[in-house]
């Protein structure tokens, strides 16, 4: 997700059409224990013993490779390109041949997407009101690590910090150490998960709610994202995608507490193309028309994401920063101080140019690193990404998919049964 730099006068603060059953989980049935051999009858012994609940064993997550030993992973959803000028691509044998030459490249994305689907299924079935943000982040990220069978290495694993932005916070929030924020029944939480394999990042997000009063907000954003996916393709102008997205998104409104709110595109948030080990790589995909006549090209990978809001439809940075990433092309910059050099070595060895958060540094045993981290930010070696917010009291939602522009068709690689 990328942001625009324009800044209007309004002051303000990353979806799935999902309903989670917040009722209490079913209690496992109880069984009668066997009587002890102390001369008592089985009945007497059973009456004196307390009934014991069956212990429910948690299913252990195993590496995704175990499910696909041949290394061939499920394909995503195939869509034909929207422009008539591209109709020949569907039947072109030459284009199919070119696509096969990049098979390993595509398999990395498909592996990451299958991990993503399994992780978000676990998240959707496990997250409940009352959990704190660190519990939720750990649930998701530890699942990614287990399926990838890598502990956040540069080979495969977490593509970026899990976004868990609540309500008017649209993106770039994940808990830092000590954060006590708890998920409430009336919250609107954007769940943004990244998985990478050999630097090929699958970026996909949904919004989780428990109260059906947000249904129209979620539907608006989900339909807008699907519109962006449908309109995207080789030779399509970025401006035209934004125009189509806005038309769908802003045809919706939401009633809340007796008041009707128009649902607005958050106009300074965009989709983006994805590079190797780079979550943002050059082009941005607007969600409103912006005059950008740049075209999508064959072989590119894009994250098509849209954000809707009941607020001003514009976000600004606010709050404690948790997200960071090393800027590419900064190896020649002089590193300010020994502690900053040491921290930079840790960043290079564990993340490269993939985004990361403070919790990941904590997990690696780093401590007292904030001064050195701020020095790297000021030197331009590391980029900080603070939370971005719409006006307080508003609600924001997000849906996102990763698409692959094959020579003959596009593949919505992150598509699942859920969204």
UniProtKB/Swiss-Prot annotation:
Its cofactor is Co(2+); Zn(2+); Mn(2+); Fe(2+). Cotranslationally removes the N-terminal methionine from nascent proteins. The N-terminal methionine is often cleaved when the second residue in the primary sequence is small and uncharged (Met-Ala-, Cys, Gly, Pro, Ser, Thr, or Val). It is found in: Cytoplasm. The keyword Manganese does not apply. The gene is MAP2. Binds 2 divalent metal cations per subunit. Has a high-affinity and a low affinity metal-binding site. The true nature of the physiological cofactor is under debate. The enzyme is active with cobalt, zinc, manganese or divalent iron ions. Most likely, methionine aminopeptidases function as mononuclear Fe(2+)-metalloproteases under physiological conditions, and the catalytically relevant metal-binding site has been assigned to the histidine-containing high-affinity site. The keyword Secreted does not apply. One of its GO terms (molecular function) is initiator methionyl aminopeptidase activity. It comes from Debaryomyces hansenii (strain ATCC 36239 / CBS 767 / BCRC 21394 / JCM 1990 / NBRC 0083 / IGC 2968) (Yeast). Signal peptide: none annotated. Residues 1-69 are annotated as: Disordered. Keywords: Aminopeptidase, Cytoplasm, Hydrolase, Metal-binding, Protease. Its EC number is 3.4.11.18. One of its GO terms (cellular component) is cytoplasm. This is Methionine aminopeptidase 2. Residues 48-61 have a biased composition (Basic residues). Residues 11-29 have a biased composition (Basic and acidic residues). A divalent metal cation 1 binds at residues 192, 203, 400. Residues 30-41 have a biased composition (Acidic residues). It comes from the Eukaryota. A divalent metal cation 2 binds at residues 203, 272, 305, 400. It catalyses: Release of N-terminal amino acids, preferentially methionine, from peptides and arylamides.
